[in-house]
Amino acid sequence: IANMLEGKAPLSIRHAVFLAEWAYLDGNLDYEKDFCEPIKKGADYLRRLIAVNHWEKYKTAKQIALCNFFFYPCSGNGQKPFEYDFSNEFPEDDWRYQLVSRTIKIHKGQCHSLPWTFKLYAEELGANVSLAHAPRHCFIMYKDEDNLFPENWVNVEITAQQYQPTWAIKEHFAISD
């Protein structure tokens, strides 16, 4: 991470997330197998999905494809969309359930790991999305360059598999202007 910050290595959110999780797991994580391979495979599928559906005409085709990949069963995600993990399999002091590597592997996660996983797939695909934070929560935002939504920015609530208007996010999280 220091090399990225000092300009000695290219900036990579994927590599930074991997390094943090690798350290947390005492080195029991493989960058290629656990991060690169599944993300590259997913991005390759998304490129084909865009082409087959003729979504290239949309400036936000990559974002549309990502939402489909995360929300709906398809061959590219093994017929297993990414879902909120309601299980309580880890105690409160065990953060493994929050890890992006776990979400990539089992397609289940929390309000931290699901949006970060989306961001890593977006980075590989070249889709311009941003991580947005609310109190104790995280979601995805991207500019609506195709005017498909009533607002200039699209808020993607990965944990609920839906789009959220800005007013709803502000109301739910008690955010003011």
Task: Identify the meaning behind each predicted range.
Residues 1-177:
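A structural boundary/capping signal
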